[in-house]
């Protein structure tokens, strides 16, 4: 029975009940729990997990404690805070790049013609599905030099942009459909 105890019960030298709330999050072979109790203390970890009502909340808390403890070991002075500052800095740089690109595009097509980020059609799961971005990148990579040059020419008005994109990508898809394959390389023959 002693070998089946979870990491928390081993540290606290208690018997591990069959429905122990710590066992799913800190199994007996979990080496990260030693780091967690080194930083937060076993009693504090138990109090945090005991005060949570649902197993999903305990799982999130256990992962957060694990992440924060590892960050504190790597950087004893600032821990997670330093990583948060780094990510905020990256986000600020990206926002500045976007603002710069919008301003530059505005000089070519007019500031009133530049679409706002909330106006752009984008599915809710766009960032979660790599297929949407990968297929677009594959299309761009498969362009010939003439098509790339056409794509790189900025339109004089925002109304011309869809026409240019359709002319480039539409022609490429038509070509790919003639040889029995879509732009992403999949067969259009449906097993015929």
UniProtKB/Swiss-Prot annotation:
Q: Which residue intervals define the domain LOB in the entry?
A: 4-105
PROSITE patterns associated with the record? LOB
Query: Origin, by domain of life?
Result: Eukaryota
The family this protein is said to belong to: Belongs to the LOB domain-containing protein family.
**Name of protein:** LOB domain-containing protein 32
Species of origin reads: Arabidopsis thaliana (Mouse-ear cress)
The beginning of the lineage is:
Eukaryota, Viridiplantae, Streptophyta, Embryophyta, Tracheophyta
Q: Its encoding gene is what?
A: LBD32
